[in-house]
Regions:
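Conserved C-terminal beta-signal and adjacent last beta-strands/turns
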Residues: 8-9, 240-243, 425, 483, ...
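Short, acidic, small-residue-rich periplasmic hinge/interaction motif at the N-terminus
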Residues: 23-63, 102, 526
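Extracytoplasmic beta-strand/coil segments of soluble accessory domains associated
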Residues: 71-113, 135
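Short acidic/polar hinge/loop motifs at secondary-structure boundaries
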Residues: 113-141, 160
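Transmembrane beta-barrel wall of Gram-negative outer-membrane proteins
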Residues: 176-207, 212-249, 287, 292-302, ...
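Face-selective signature of the C-terminal outer-membrane beta-barrel domain
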Residues: 287-452, 473-477, 481-484, 525-531, ...
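Membrane-embedded beta-barrel scaffold of Gram-negative outer-membrane proteins
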Residues: 305-311, 473-486, 507-563, 568-572, ...
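Gram-negative outer-membrane beta-barrel transporters
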Residues: 430, 533-535, 555-654
Length: 735
């Protein structure tokens, strides 16, 4: 074990002051780092684990972190596609892996689930600049290893918060760029105090006007931790959270306007009494979220470690919007009779839709390493309680409003999620290892109250899942080959229940995942190939069918799959130049897909839906080809990187209709920087990024809706246009 002798004392405050009290200390840094690794060892894969994964280091995160949301730092990971509502990667963003949406990707921070328990999604607008407090991120593709929480149904993103830094430090970073984008971060730590204590803290603020009109965002976040180390003991408390206000840009841009004003934003649009088109200024999303983790790790014996984590998250917020010509009936109000004696069915109003929730639980992990065996036992229990309610804040017909802040719906969702797993890797020989992973997961979910669309809701469902995984791994010299089979299950989310109506309740989905791969690592190059076949049973998809309450119905389809090959590699072209890249070729299909289209007569009277049997079709938002390439130059403090990516055609629905699709696009980003180390501080670094270097006009997401009126089909589609060439410059000071 490496030991470091040093003199330290003092608290480095965020104002930059340092007070020093010298004392000799002997610190086993390897021991400190190993205790931190125990926290994530239960959910992160090791090299010999037979799954496809990529590790993103802290250095890579810091190098590319210039204010965009975290998924934009994954763009050079195989099979990852990202999109942004505002167009410039700040605020509301989302990611897909192998075409799998975020509601099917499991996200954890130090093993604690991050996915929303009800929607299964992750809202990165609530985690601005979280990359500045992350030590490493592992992105597993496919079913992956057993983890905690919902949505482990196609990919896993396991994040580890920053390791303790044993010497005092202070860093400040400011970035400014196109579309009024500013990102500021200060972070610091005490180093080791009294040979036992470490304190770290960060504060960040990110602001932007957005590429899309009015897609402004103002987001602040913080991270703070206090850790205690003593021999084989680690106790750490950490808290992180954020507040955000962002103007809505959820509607996208219709296809006609893409050619004339691709930055147009229809959110908040209304027409006043004089017939003048205006935009409601407070058409915003507002949210506050705070996470609290208490982690304890104890080395019980040589090779045996126990970790226990308690966690609590509270969140609250609302989005406010202007509703023109809203029906009184939707807001549980009678029609209004005006002074002229005529009944009015509609009015203009402003509403707020609220969510207040609490999420808390406990996790335990026991890791054992001895000779040929590595084993992990884990268990967790998590409880969620969330109140959904809506209020009318203003109404044009003031007399029709029953009371201020009139509440027109309220429901409560409660979810108990518990699991236990045992996974082990056993070395059968010097080169061959066997892997097994068994998980049981149980869910109790209820929704009661009233909904803004469905009226009364009364859902009570329980699920019990058994998720086995097994595989073999062979490693000799620089060669590594593996094969695995895994089963995963996913319960329906809140929307699947509330918008399907009482007589069309969905059931769970099942994934059978087959993976096989090969990697070679040499002195100057590495390459890898991974084959996958993901076979779905009862996958939930939109078919166009309308539920009995008039909402789009998500239906369980019996037969669908994703299969493909992922290639990756890298080479050192010169001592100062590296290249790395990846390619994914895939086929993503639904067998026997049936489309349902809303149908009307010439006078817009509702007719039965038109049914189209389309046979085998492509799964929406699943490009058949993606690739990425990075040239990385580094010489005497100078750095430069040229990063390129290509995303093939993505269909907006499951019909494989080219007219309802997103065109393929190719992007390149350039980053150049210089860092030097003056005698009075650790480092001064300046870098400049040019995003979308070749000024491509492209869209990365969207939606579509079709109807038939008097025998003619028409389609409305919205596309999320992304920023053309734009710039970002950053200055970083390290003390």
């Amino acid at each position: 074990m490496r030991k470091i002798f040093y003199s330290v004392a003092g608290l480095l405050t965020l104002s930059g002051g340092v007070s020093i009290t010298a004392q000799q200390a002997v610190v086993d840094t390897t021991n400190v780092y190993e205790l931190n690794e125990v926290v994530v060892s239960a959910v992160q894969a090791r090299r010999e684990t037979p799954v496809a994964f990529r590790n993103v280091s802290a250095a890579e995160l810091r190098e590319n972190n210039t204010g965009q949301s975290l998924p934009y730092l994954f763009t050079q990971t195989p099979s990852v596609v990202v999109t942004s509502d505002g167009g410039n990667g700040v605020g509301y963003v989302s990611m897909r892996v192998r075409g799998t949406d975020a509601g099917r990707i499991n996200f954890t921070v130090d093993g604690v689930p991050v996915n929303d328990s009800e929607s299964h999604g992750v809202f990165w607008v609530n985690m601005p600049d979280f990359a500045s407090s992350v030590e490493s991120i592992q992105i597993q593709r496919g079913a992956g290893t057993s983890t905690n929480g919902a949505a482990a149904f196609g990919a896993t993103v396991a994040m580890q918060t920053q390791r303790p830094r044993l010497e005092p430090y202070f860093e400040a970073s400011s970035a400014a760029g196109s579309y009024g984008t500013f990102a500021h971060t200060v972070r610091g730590g005490t180093g080791l105090i009294g040979n036992h204590f470490v304190f770290d803290a960060r504060y960040s603020n990110v602001q932007t006007d957005g590429y899309i009109e009015r897609a402004r965002a103002n987001m602040s976040s913080y991270y703070a931790s206090a850790a205690y180390y003593n021999g084989g003991t680690m106790i750490k408390f950490q808290t992180f959270g954020s507040s955000e206000v962002s103007y809505q840009a959820w509607n996208g841009v219709d296809s006609a306007r893409l050619r004339t004003n691709r930055r147009y934003n229809s959110c908040g649009e209304y027409t006043d009494e004089n017939g003048v088109k205006k935009f409601y200024d407070n058409q915003t999303d507002n949210y506050w979220q705070h996470h609290y983790h208490l982690l304890a790790t104890q080395r019980l014996t040589d090779g045996l470690n126990l970790n226990v984590t308690l966690h609590y998250t509270d969140g609250r917020g609302y989005y406010e919007d202007y509703k023109a010509r809203a029906k009184y009936a939707v807001y549980k109000l009678p029609n209004y009779t005006g002074a002229d004696g005529k009944a009015q069915k509609r009015t203009d109003l402003v509403r707020r839709k609220w969510l207040q929730n609490d999420f808390y639980g406990a996790l335990a992990r026991l890791t054992y390493t001895r000779d040929r065996l590595q084993a992990v036992w884990g268990a967790s229990i998590n409880n969620y309680a969330g109140d959904h309610f809506g209020r009318v804040m203003w109404m044009k017909t003031v007399e029709a409003m029953p009371r201020p802040d009139y509440e027109y719906y309220r429901s409560r969702g409660e979810k108990l999620d518990y699991n236990t797993f045992l996974k082990a890797s056993y070395r059968l020989s010097n080169a061959l290892s066997a892997y097994a992973d068994l998980q049981y997961r149980g869910i109790n979910y209820s929704i009661t109250g009233t909904d803004d669309k469905a009226g009364a809701i009364d859902v009570h469902r329980t699920f019990s899942f058994f998720n086995p995984k097994a595989g073999l791994s062979y490693e000799r010299g620089g060669n590594h080959a593996y094969a695995s089979f895994a089963v995963a299950h996913r319960e329906p989310n809140r929307k699947n229940f509330t918008e399907n109506g009482p007589s069309a309740q969905p059931t769970y989905e099942t994934l059978y995942d087959y993976e096989a791969g090969y990697e070679y690592t040499g002195r100057a190059f590495h390459l890898g190939a991974n084959l996958y076949y993901m076979d779905y049973d009862n996958q939930l998809v939109l078919t166009g069918k309308i539920s009995e309450i008039g909402e789009p119905l998500t239906s369980n389809i019996k037969d669908s799959y994703r299969m493909g090959v992922e290639l990756s590699g890298g080479v050192r072209l010169a001592p100062w130049l590296d290249w790395s890249g990846h390619v994914t070729l895939s086929s993503n299909k639904i067998r026997g897909f049936t489309e349902y289209v809303d149908t009307y007569d010439k006078d817009w009277n509702v007719l039965p839906q038109t049914v189209n049997e389309l046979g085998t079709t492509d799964i929406a938002f699943s490009p058949n080809l993606t690739f990425g390439s990075t040239f990385d130059f580094h010489w005497r403090g100078f750095t430069a990187a040229l990063m390129s990516s290509y995303v093939g055609r993505q269909y907006l629905d499951n019909t494989s209709a080219r007219e309802r699709s997103i065109d393929p696009y190719f992007l390149s980003d350039l980053r150049v920087g210089y860092a030097f180390h003056p005698h009075f501080m650790k480092e001064i670094a300046l870098d400049v990024s040019v995003r979308n270097l070749f000024n491509a006009e492209y869209e990365s997401g969207g939606w579509t809706y079709s109807s038939i009126q008097d025998g003619r089909r028409s389609t409305s589609s919205g596309y999320f246009a992304q920023a053309t060439r734009n710039f970002m410059a950053r200055l970083t000071l390290k003390f």
